[in-house]
Design a protein with these regions (language model features):
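Gram-negative (and chloroplast) outer-membrane scaffold detector with strong preference
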Residues: 20, 28-30, 34, 53-124, ...
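Sec-dependent signal peptide recognition
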Residues: 1-8
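Sec/Tat signal peptide C-region and signal peptidase I cleavage site
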Residues: 13-17
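Residues that define the transmembrane beta-barrel architecture of outer-membrane proteins
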Residues: 18, 47-51, 89-95, 131-137, ...
Length: 188
């Protein structure tokens, strides 16, 4: 038992000495979160607020590698006009876990990233709710600019989700499984 604990401490100690960062990310989607089909017996109108925001932490590792964990909030909103008027507003919490690789050293560092994400829609049961929980892949690229104690990181990110969160029975409304987002992170 003592040897196992000692081995654990020796193995974990270098990881604890690595730089740690935290901050806030905000951005806008490049494509619509919901796709609305042509009007039929049931008509939908998308009215989603176009923003993504949330905190993140980054564990900086040797050789310009890092691991980033985000908690991003994205809003969804739509109206159903027939047969009875109904508005649905909800939010999705997305939790990407990303491996990042800095491509060059210096004060301006381009990077690539990839990983997985979990998502949870916080909505009451509605007819169009297909999957409250989702998972998918995340790919991205960006640039980190060092400004004193701050790091500013604009990036473009792609999310490929496994399921559609919303999908109407008649196919007039469905959430987009492929989402692209421009984000800017400010960290310490």
């Amino acid at each position: 038992m003592y040897r196992t604990f000692l081995l654990f401490v020796v193995a974990v100690a270098p990881a604890l000495a690595q730089p740690f960062g935290f901050g806030l990310k905000a951005g806008i989607p490049l494509n619509d979160a919901l796709a609305v089909g042509p009007g039929g017996a049931i008509s939908y109108v998308q009215s989603t607020h176009r923003y993504v925001v949330g905190p993140f932490v980054e564990f900086r590792l040797p050789a310009r590698f890092s691991v980033e964990i985000d908690a991003l909030y994205r809003s969804y909103s739509y109206r159903q006009s027939l047969p009875a008027a109904q508005s649905v507003s909800t939010g999705a919490w997305e939790f990407p876990v990303l491996a990042k690789k800095g491509l060059f050293g210096g004060p301006i560092q381009p990077y690539i990233e990839g990983g997985v994400a979990l998502s949870h829609l916080s909505v009451n049961d509605v007819l169009e709710l297909n999957h409250r929980n989702n998972y998918g892949i995340v790919l991205g690229a960006g640039v980190t600019v060092h400004l004193g104690l701050f790091r500013i990181s604009p990036e473009i990110r792609y999310n490929g989700w496994a399921f559609r969160g919303f999908e109407s029975p008649v196919g007039m409304l469905e959430s987009n499984r492929n989402q692209a987002t421009v984000l800017v992170g400010i960290s310490f």
